[in-house]
Structure formats: structure tokens, C-alpha cells
Amino acid sequence: MTNRRGVGAALLGAALLAATASCAPGEEGGGRTPPPLPAASDAAGATASASVSATASVAASVAAGATPGGGETNPTPAAPRTLVTGLTVPWAIAFLPGGDALVTERESARLLRVTPRGQVHEVAVIEGVSASGEGGLLGVAVSPRYAADHFVFVYFTAGNDNRIVRYRYDGRLSDRRVLVSGIPKGAIHNGGRLAFGPDGYLYASTGETGERGMAQDKKSLGGKILRMTADGRPAPGNPFGTLVWTYGHRNVQGMAWDDRGHMYATEFGQNTYDEINLIEKGHNYGWPEVEGVGGRPGYTDPLLTWSTAEASPSGLAYARGSLWAAALRGERLWRVPVDGSGRAGRPAALYTGEYGRLRAVAVAPDGTLWVGTSNRDGRGSPRDGDDRILVVRPSS
């Protein structure tokens, strides 16, 4: 992979890992380098092995909460408020003009409309969804020209594939049209995130379904980020003349853009590193040849990595100068400041263990974050009222 920060950055990241082995909620979680971040643990009195004595000053700056610019750490947001309870594996959130949101439920195949006051209305049960394993009704996106075209888009697992379907929505769904079919499906790694970029085109993430080879096969739709028009055609400027925008992905679960148009994506690693990647046209992100930072020509290294216990990063949003990544296995919301060049500052872990598995995160028109839990997906420990949507007011 192409190492954006160089060997010195890698050594710094390794030093941080050795010197700092715990991270309480809201505490800084690592450097601005691509190597692994310090392990995060909320256990009181957790200590580090401190096998690299030369890192004392680096560890001290992390503990003091210094930002890349030398200032103070961003304040921790206030505790979330619960907007909605009683959902079943809410997978994606996309906002309509006016502030209501469309929310997908993976298992039930229900498309819901949720108001800012917490009212829930069933729009429809999406036809043709085959929910099993990690498949089901996954992503949803609203056209940036919704006022004119009333288009909404869903990504779901069908009987033989994953597919992207467009509807017209004006209080009810109509004019169903399959835009993309034949996306590989499996019990795992179905991708499924949909989002419109600032260029007005629809992006979709796909997984490699556990079949590693398809991630490097540019002719396969699996293990990719796709870019298309609202009619499902390859968008102008795509690097290979197909739907494929980037390849070498294992299972991208979140996509977001910052104020300057930089694109970021969260990705599940296997057993070692989860990632946030800076997404660039035509790049190869390495899977299965590389997991995490490889420094190998031809592969693009991640912007940040975590241990899989800290993250399993899913939904991703950008607000107030930071990326906000929902973590499933890590049971926390990560805040990652990014600068105008797409470089990342030190991540902070928020609400660790307080709400269980977090999957969806989206920015509402009023600037708040809506965060969906995923405690009823068979891998969590449901609490009374789960699953729920939380509202977070992000700090600057």
C-alpha cells in the first residue's frame, strides 16, 4: 500500500501503541498516523506494558489531550437522548427534506419514516428481501434532487444476489425500478451502504461475501465501492468505464464526505485491523493481500486503523470538523477530527459500552447526529427498549 505518512509515522504509531493501552470514553485514542491506534479499554486502572521507554513524551501529550494543532481536545458531547425505541436492527438512516428520516430494518425488511419528535410510521415492507446472516434490507439514500424527482434508493439482499432498487416516494412507494442486480451475496460481507456524494452521484459499498478473490477482480461487483447515476449507469469519469470506483475492499460499511469533498469509508478487517480509508478514484485498498498498513506499492494504506475489539466500524458521518464512526463490536462512537487535507487527528471514544452495538450514524438537517443501535442482530445483548435511535449533539 502507499504509506501516506512514511516510516517515521509508523514508528510513532507503534510507540503510541506500546505506551498507551487504555482509553476512557471521551479520552483521546491515538495519533494522526496510519499505524494501529492505542488499544481502548474502560477498565479502571488499566495499564500499558510500556516496552518502549522513548515514548514517554508522546504518551504524555496524548493523555493531556493535545490536538494536532497543539490546542485543547474537543469537548465531549452531552449524553445522547433517546428518540425512538422498539426497533429491530435498524441498519441505515437517510434524511428527507424537512427533517424526517427514512430508516431501514435489516431483518423485517421494513422501511420506516421517523420524525424528529420520535413518531414512527411504516412506509412499506420492501418486496423481494431475503434476510439471513448479514443480509437483508440494508442501505437507503434520498436523492439530492428529491424536491423534483422524489427518488429514494434501497440496497437489499434478494434470493440470489444483492441489488439496488429505486422508488418514487410521495407518502407511499411507487415506480419500482431495479438499477443494479448481480451484486454477490453471502451469509457475510454483503456491503450495503448507499450515499450520494457532493458530485451528485450515488455511491454503494459491496462486500466480498467471504470470497476473497473477488475484491481484487475489477470485473466483479463484490468488494468494491461503486459510483453510478440515478438511473444505475456508470457515472462519468469512473476509472474503469464500469460501476467500479475503488476496489480491494473486504466489507465497506460506512461512507462520508467532508466539507472539501474528501471521501472516507469505514471497513471491517478480519482479525487484526479495522480501518478508515481516504477514498480516491481507482485506488486499490489491498484486501486480501494486505490488512491494515502494508507499505506495499500498488496498494493504498488506511488513514487510521483500530484493533477489531475496539471498532468493527459501521456507519460513518461527517460533522463539525470530525468523522463520527459507529462501532459494533467496540460498542462506542468514535470521533476522528480531520483537517482540510484529509489528514486525521487523534480519535476519541465516546459512550463506550453505554448503549451496546452502534451501527448507523447520520447527520440530521439540524446538525445533530442520529445513531442507531444494533443489539438485536444476534451478536449483542438487548436491553429494554432496544433497538433504539439516539440523538447526539456533536461538539465542535
Model-assigned labels for residue ranges:
Residues R359:
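Segments of small-molecule ligand-sensing domains
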Residues A19-S22:
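C-terminal motif of bacterial Sec signal peptides marking the signal peptidase cleavage site
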Residues G6-G8, A24-A48, S61-E211, H262-G269, ...:
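Acidic, Gly/Ser/Thr-rich repeat motifs that build Ca2+-stabilized beta-propeller blades
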